[in-house]
Amino acid sequence: MSSMNKRVFDILRELDSLVDFSRAKLQWDILIILATKGPSSTTEISQTINTSRKSIIDAIRKLVDKELVTKVKGDIYGLSEKGEKLLESFDSIMSINVTDKPDSSIESNSISLTNIAEYFYMLEILKMALLNKQITIDKASHELGISKQTLKYYIETFTENKLLKVVNQESVLGKSKKIYVLTDESRKLVSRLPELTRLKRNLPLKILLKLTGSYRYEIALTKVMLFNVISIPVLMYLKDQLGILEAIWLYVIILLPLLSIFAEIFNRI
């Protein structure tokens, strides 16, 4: 790996260790707002990104703990010196190629990290494709909470940069649909980012996502909680009528939360 590429990946590791892109988008939104607008109140931040003030306060508390944000006065917060350096580190890798290829093909295979949002979605999409082998725009956009058009833009960008490749898959009904899978180039990137490397080894998470039909841990966890909230009262009401199904149902109620717990533990190892 060239010295420039090594520097890029070192910076990416540093960024990922300070604020986990794949799990803390709200924190990055706050950092971006403070970087562009300057010191702001929690109410202003809440209105800007259309998120509850309580969520903003919780996220800011975590950023303060990480020494990325500091209280200016009262309810107003601004970037700390460490926070400013974090964004400067990101700026330093904008438009830098992150490919090992030294020949003329380097231009078409390079990743231009034009903004933090692009980096966030790059990691999220790589993460989903890594855990689920393949992704579709419809399902991925729903789980990320963004429009299909927005996600399509990012996916097409990453496809052009050789991070994803499109495959036409035929359904049982004979209809063709586009799915996206990782390329060899993106697998190299995955192997160099700690967060994605941990996910690759996270078997409980892969099983949980498969059982719940989800791309992301947060969505799977929501489905598990909803399933248990509905199932437990129903099971108690019908317990004398289900027979062997009662034992199976109870097993699933216990299994899913356990998988959720182990998935989180494995992600921290």
Curated annotation (Swiss-Prot):
The chain crosses the membrane at residues 218-238, 242-262. The gene is arnR1. One of its GO terms (molecular function) is DNA binding. It is found in: Cell membrane. The lineage of its organism: Archaea, Thermoproteota, Thermoprotei, Sulfolobales, Sulfolobaceae. It is a multi-pass membrane protein. Disruption phenotype: Deletion results in impaired swimming motility. This is HTH-type transcriptional activator ArnR1. Residues 42-65 bind DNA. It comes from Sulfolobus acidocaldarius (strain ATCC 33909 / DSM 639 / JCM 8929 / NBRC 15157 / NCIMB 11770).
